[in-house]
Amino acid sequence: MSSENKNGKVPLISKIAYGFGDVGCNFSWMFVSNFLMIFYTDVFGISMAAVSALMLFSRFWDAINDPIVGGLTDKTKSKWGRYRPWLLVAAPITAILLVMTFWARPDWPQNGKIIYMVITYCLLVLGYTCVNIPYGTLCGAMTQDIDERAKINTSRSVAAMIAIGVLNIITVPLLSKFGSHSAKTGYLTVAVIYGCIFAACHFFCFAKTKEAVITPEKEKISVKIQLKAVMQNRPYLLALAGQILFGFTLYGRNADILYYFTYVEGNASYYTTYSMCIIIPSIIGAACFQPLFRKLNNKGRTASLFALFTGISMLSMFFFNAKESPAVFYALSGLTQFFFSGFNTAIYAIIPDCVEYGEWKTGLRNDGFQYAFISLGNKIGMAVGTALLAGLLGKYGYIANHTQNAIVLSIMKHAFTTIPGVLWIVTAVVLFFYRLNKKRYNEIVEELKNGRKS
């Protein structure tokens, strides 16, 4: 049962299927990150303060369930492997939870709304964790070849960028079409459509991928020992720091984006135009990861370079807007997305290599456990970014569906440009210190293979 040839090559269909997994993830999670906050405040009628509190509370929930799910995936035994069965079982459940999350009842009392919001969102996050952690870990289980892993992650990122582009272009028109009489009906209908896409993509990923890297049987290892091993894995710690910053910048900005176009630019339809302008640069940027990696032979340095230019181009966007300087604004948007897409490919390509380094350094291989903390780091960044945005907007007088005051508009503009721009540059500095290059990685893999043989 292997999708990996003896020379470590992975069939094209398996790479495509793996990419489809992230198509599904983005039709769920990017819909949530881009539209859930404005759905809560402007459609469901929940206060900014309650939304901000939820974003922070949910990360405590993640701190509990992410490592547990990661550990459980490592211990899973089935004829389909350790990680693939989770896609088959958890994907349809998560699709149902997505629909429940976007089931608005604005006529309920505020306390009832908040209780429903907390329960459905926390269950959705748990469901997504049960899909995304095994999905992310699966790449490392498909092959140990560093170049093949780069190709698999490029396939993942290209597919993800296409999915994000399509989602961003069609979502606002779909919400308008299905919500012409009621905004809550529009959101619910779109959630049903995207939930079906989410489940179908993961079924395809399950069917056409295989786990080829065989992990030796080992005795039960405590969480304490696994944490100690993780703390000795320097490349992994840098990747984790990068993921925290990545989550803060990506999801904080995504939560702001519809507010930005609706209130700062004054026209929510600009969001669709913006999305159309960034889809092609997204795909090209993802495809450019491999040639740049071949040049630098270091995935961390590759990610660092992409992050640096993402930050510079995002900072430049502060000086322009879609209403008065559309050509420059949309050109900079495309440039920003090009560099971001390259970074997105690189940062996820790093993670499987850190697993091999950790096994070489400590003698312990715990793919799912390590990916769980990567996922947690990303979600912590997301929590801080979205909660901070919601908290600031609420504090300075945001009123749903009304003209906003100057301070609120300023917060929305900076959250879209300068704040994430600076944080991208910080991310570039952090990942510059990633030392695990291609030559050293291949030496480590050979040592591990020889050690297992002996």
How does the language model describe each region?
Residues 2-454:
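Membrane-embedded alpha-helical bundles of multi-pass transporters/translocases
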